[in-house]
Amino acid sequence: MALSWLQRVELALFAAAFLCGAVAAAAMTRTQGSFSGRCPLYGVATLNGSSLALSRPSAPSLCYFVAGASGLLALYCLLLLLFWIYSSCIEDSHRGAIGLRIALAISAIAVFLVLVSACILRFGTRSLCNSIISLNTTISCSEAQKIPWTPPGTALQFYSNLHNAETSSWVNLVLWCVVLVLQVVQWKSEATPYRPLERGDPEWSSETDALVGSRLSHS
């Protein structure tokens, strides 16, 4: 059975969500790796001579959550894409009511996780940048990437990576919201399927009586 146009749009959105999730997870992992495993989100920077240092990082689990949530959702999108491609080519591509309800629940959870991750990235990056700018060594976080950090090699392109992760997360949130809306539309359309009138239905009897009555009146 061929995929419906709603399912095709949904698969295209899943492909885009996979890319966004993969970019966010990779950018967050690179950022944490550049700080030797410490999480810079909501961190506090200090001056160490002429260089910067991350004196008070956040708990590593905070960055693990952002990278893990983005990575798991990207993996889910990839597996779902492969499953639907296989189903459309080999088996029946129709999704039952139970499968649609499960997909709705997963999409709702995904919207929540991506929203939380995007907010953590937004406010965590802003807190770190405010800490850096308050030292009066630079006027922006992007310029702070050019300043040496202690230990050497720390914070390589940290702001660019955090910005990419945040942007990808917000785009991912929009994609998941659209996916959720499409799935709700499919669920409602399958919940009230079209059924032609049959003998014995109240509507059939009323329409038949009206037609017979009008013919008798004309005769």
From Swiss-Prot:
Keywords: Membrane, Phosphoprotein, Transmembrane, Transmembrane helix. The chain crosses the membrane at residues 9-29, 65-85, 96-116, 167-187. Residues 198-219 are annotated as: Disordered. Its main location: membrane. It is a multi-pass membrane protein. This is Transmembrane protein 179B. GO terms for cellular component: azurophil granule membrane; ficolin-1-rich granule membrane; nuclear speck; nucleolus; plasma membrane; secretory granule membrane. It is found in: Membrane. PANTHER family: TRANSMEMBRANE PROTEIN 179B. The modification Phosphoserine is found at residues 206, 214. The lineage of its organism: Eukaryota, Metazoa, Chordata, Craniata, Vertebrata. Belongs to the TMEM179 family.
